[in-house]
Amino acid sequence: MYVVNRKGEEEPVSFDQILSRITKLSYGLHPLVDPARVTQAVINGLYSGIKTSELDELASQTCAYMAATHNDFSKLAARISTSNLHKNTSSDIGDVASQLYNFKDNQGCPAPLISKPVYDFIMENRERINSKIDFSKDFEYDYFAFKTLERSYLLKIDNKVVERPQHLLMRVSCGIHCGDIEAALETYELLSQKYFTHATPTLFNSGTPRPQMSSCFLLRIPEDSINGIFDTLTKCANISKTAGGLGVAVSNIRGTGSYIRGTNGRSNGLIPMLRVYNDTARYIDQGGGKRKGAIAIYLEPWHVDVVEFIEIRKNHGKEEMRCRDLFPALWVPDLFMERVEKDQDWTLMCPDECRGLQDVWGDDFKKLYEEYEKQGRGRKTMKAQKLWFLILQAQIETGTPFICYKDAANSKSNQKNLGTIVSSNLCTEIIEYTSTDEVAVCNLASIGLPKFVDKNNKTFDFDKLKEVTKVITRNLNKLIDVGYYSLKECKKSNLRHRPLGIGIQGLADCFMMLRMPYESEGAKKLNKQIFEVIYYAALDASCELAEKYGPYETYSGSPASKGILQFDMWGVTPDSGLCDWDLLKDRISKHGIRNSLLISPMPTASTSQILGNNESFEPFTSNIYHRRVLSGEFFVVNPHLLNDLLELGLWDDRLKQNIIANNGSIQNILTIPEDIRELYKTVWEIKQKTVIDMAADRGPYVCQSQSLNIHMENANFAKLSSMHFYGWKKGLKTGIYYLRTQSATRPIQFTVDQQLLKSETKEKDSLETNKRQALEPEAQKLIACPLRPTNMKDDEECMMCSG
């Protein structure tokens, strides 16, 4: 048997050579990672004539599939792939920049992949940049992170990767701080150490000829006309092609059967229009297949087409009424929630016949809405609860619609001086003002919280958190000035209001590293402290920028200009002692702030996997599972749990099979100590009241909003209704992003070794009984809610499809 080396020469397969290569890459890994075992597994998969680069890929995949034994196999898999990448790429940033800048397309025309200013900046500082890049950090990613980077983030020429991960981070840093080498190197150092990451569009596009680095865009259709609808559609397409996610407000579009003055005809309503937007979302992908375009559509629940709207993602019904590539979202006024709670009537209206409802909130909305009701302008009157239960049914089946609370969003916004905010964004964490000539924009970054934990002393470094947050604030503010805008309306909005979106990832990891169960008082306290410090540091940096460059254009009249910060709007007084709020308020009163908005904990699906953290502020969904993304499917084990079980001498194949059989839960495995079981509860075992409480606790320091998912086993109307009302009464701006559900009935698990589990069947049955008894009163623990549907049993099974 032979292999073909990179020179095209045939060589006999050598066990010792493969073993030597794998051994060199196994430094610092757990003893369970046995290079000889890995080598033998690789040898077993060889065929004669395999190329050495293919041999590396085979070795890497072999290790990846062994990651269920220990996560260090995933690290070894990544190291093999990284080593292979390093063999095929230059280490010199100047060489890489030259390849990218001098690229020509298939017709021989110049098609540079990085901009001339960035290329010139890199070449001017080539020697210094090369001296600062640490390629050993490329070997710190796990396999899942590396394959994600390789598939979507590292720049390619003719489908061949030419960047290394450290080159990517340096390109991003130079793209942001072109002309300022000190700031670029500061950013690179923090990015490479995984203290934070910029959002996916920034990683995609920073340093390129068209550096569209913003993540979120909010639009309203300017007028209910062919021109208004299709001009907005064109804007959506142009934004989506450069990796932007969209939120579009459509509450001003006339409903089904409405009179059309220009043609003397009748409108087909909202859904046929949305199908055109749906097809656009399907057609546009974000930069050559990196990820699909995505659009959330926001509608207020008084709209006459609301019933059809909330069902657009259902799997059944008339196909012409379905838009499964859009994400329906409701922009809910308090008046609707009040009428649902009191079981009162609710009137559906057409915005063409009842004008202005979208543009008012609070008492003004209530006054106008009730005036239209008195005048008999409504199209249809129904029980508010009937519509409510249709919403709940759609959520149970599809995970949507998202729900944001219009009055909370407007009353607690630092942009309230601009006008009424009419929607959120794709992921419900951005809440910004839009108008007919402004498309709201936001640039995002997320902080890798586990980097601030000292595991030995069980402490959290708040001083370092302040330092990193201030760097992020300066970076995001710089993005506003150096970014590319595909629309003049985007540029106008971003330059006038200068909003930022700083989020987090790995909060659940922090709790585990500090030995704090997610529901513990310690976790609740740390959650508040982290967000207070982030908000303080971001405001501090923004004030420093305002001192240098002046406040943002529309600062005058904003709550901040009157000394009112986010926690003041919640009626909360910070009491951690970690921040000098009086001093900061005094400075803001003198200099203002450079950015209208600052904090918005967003989903971090891709970037958290690159950094190796759990998503956002979410609890772990499982302790052992497969993860599927564009780059493939990978086995993931909770690394914190695995380390604890190894230290206790409990980790073996039988325990692994037992955890798989329990769907990633360890609550029913009595061989694991109780304190460990408490620490590693999954999101399905954590009271969602706690999740909502923690969202409300951080709310006073979140000046935009937060992507709040709700997870529920055996979802029914009573439990779901209780959670919605609990969150609304806690003052949340975002009531729910996705509803994630699962049934108590599990599919047959063909991958589980049943023989290993037979001896534990009795123990499991007993514990399952105890678990059911403990979970049954969950709804009562949340909030006493009198609502009951008349057409569906409370215990009807969940029918959720993918969200």
Curated annotation (Swiss-Prot):
Which reactions are catalysed by this chain?
Answer: a 2'-deoxyribonucleoside 5'-diphosphate + [thioredoxin]-disulfide + H2O = a ribonucleoside 5'-diphosphate + [thioredoxin]-dithiol
Q: Where is the active site?
A: 425, 427, 429
Signal sequence, renumbered to the chain: none
Binding of ATP occurs at: 5-6, 11-17, 52, 56
| Cross-referenced PROSITE patterns | ATP_CONE (PS51161), RIBORED_LARGE (PS00089)
Q: Give the ATP-cone domain ranges.
A: 1-91
Intrachain disulfide bonds? 216-442
Question: What top-level class of enzyme does the UniProt entry assign?
Answer: oxidoreductase
EC number of the protein:
1.17.4.1
Instruction: Print the keywords alphabetically.
Output: Allosteric enzyme, ATP-binding, Deoxyribonucleotide synthesis, Disulfide bond, Nucleotide-binding, Oxidoreductase
Which residues bear the site annotation Interacts with thioredoxin/glutaredoxin? 798, 801
Residues reported in the UniProt entry to bind GDP:
215, 425, 429, 604-607
Instruction: Write out the residues that bind dTTP.
Output: 224-226, 241, 254, 261-262
Spell out the molecular function terms from Gene Ontology: ATP binding; ribonucleoside-diphosphate reductase activity, thioredoxin disulfide as acceptor
The lineage's top-level taxon is: Eukaryota
Single GO BP term = deoxyribonucleotide biosynthetic process
Q: Where is this site: Important for electron transfer?
A: 737-738
Q: Which Pfam families match?
A: ATP-cone, Ribonuc_red_lgC, Ribonuc_red_lgN
Regulation affecting activity: Under complex allosteric control mediated by deoxynucleoside triphosphates and ATP binding to separate specificity and activation sites on the large subunit. The type of nucleotide bound at the specificity site determines substrate preference. It seems probable that ATP makes the enzyme reduce CDP and UDP, dGTP favors ADP reduction and dTTP favors GDP reduction. Stimulated by ATP and inhibited by dATP binding to the activity site.
| Site feature: Important for hydrogen atom transfer | 216, 442
User: Which InterPro entries does the entry mention?
Assistant: ATP-cone_dom (IPR005144), NrdE_NrdA_C (IPR013346), RNR_lg_C (IPR000788), RNR_lsu_N (IPR013509), RNR_R1-su_N (IPR008926), Rrm1 (IPR039718)
Its function?
Answer: Provides the precursors necessary for DNA synthesis. Catalyzes the biosynthesis of deoxyribonucleotides from the corresponding ribonucleotides.
The family assignment reads:
Belongs to the ribonucleoside diphosphate reductase large chain family.
Could you give the subunit structure recorded for this chain?
Heterodimer of a large and a small subunit.
* Protein name per the record: Ribonucleoside-diphosphate reductase large chain
- Source organism per UniProt: Cryptosporidium parvum
What lineage does the source organism belong to? Eukaryota, Sar, Alveolata, Apicomplexa, Conoidasida
